[in-house]
Amino acid sequence: MSDTTTAENANEPRLITETGLDRRVADIIEPVLVDLGFRLVRVRMSGQNGLTLQVMTERNDGTMTVEDCEEVSKAISPVLDVEDPIDKAYHLEVSSPGIDRPMVRRSDFIRWQGHLLKCETSVLVEGRKRFRGKIVSVDEDGFRLERDQPAYGEEAGVTIPFTALSEARLILTDELIRDALTADKKAKAARAANENFEEEDRDIE
């Protein structure tokens, strides 16, 4: 897994975005999230258990706690009430991307290089639209996937342009769980150390 810095990720645009009502909601809440130090991952309306607005987000360092979810929920709820993009009663659900997360930014592919991914494209890439395999390299325009189950006669390696990507998600494995927990622990420790430094700096002033 490759590391990416918080500064590089703070204003990085998403490769995969919403359409329709989901897009309208995303446009409303994303500036609020950015001001709080979070990045929007995905917005999705769901009809399960009534109408549910699912907002998936994370801090710029990739972490997300229960307290963070509560903070985001309290911040975006009044904004949604004022803008009123949804004309029906709904339940707001704020969550982290999870370990088997959606991949929506180029930095996601860099960070999780070496792990298994499943994805779909909006156009045919080497004769198909669905792929599964390990991320082996990433450049400005796309990523290279080493398929773990290539069909007979197919090359294992395939290059997928970011512009063709319609959906992508990590596949849960023991290795992914281990690396994700390690990365989360390191990021939270770094954030705590930075907060302590800022407090000490204020005390000196």
From Swiss-Prot:
Location of the protein in the cell: Cytoplasm
Source taxon at top rank: Bacteria
Record-level GO cellular component terms: cytosol
Primary localisation category: cytoplasm
Listed InterPro entries: Ribosome_maturation_RimP, RimP_C, RimP_C_sf, RimP_N, RimP_N_sf
Biological processes, Gene Ontology terms: ribosomal small subunit assembly; translation
Keywords: Cytoplasm, Ribosome biogenesis
Keyword Cell membrane annotated: no
Purpose: Required for maturation of 30S ribosomal subunits.
Family the entry assigns: Belongs to the RimP family.
The name this protein goes by in its record: Ribosome maturation factor RimP
Species of origin: Sinorhizobium medicae (strain WSM419)
Lineage, top ranks: Bacteria, Pseudomonadati, Pseudomonadota, Alphaproteobacteria, Hyphomicrobiales
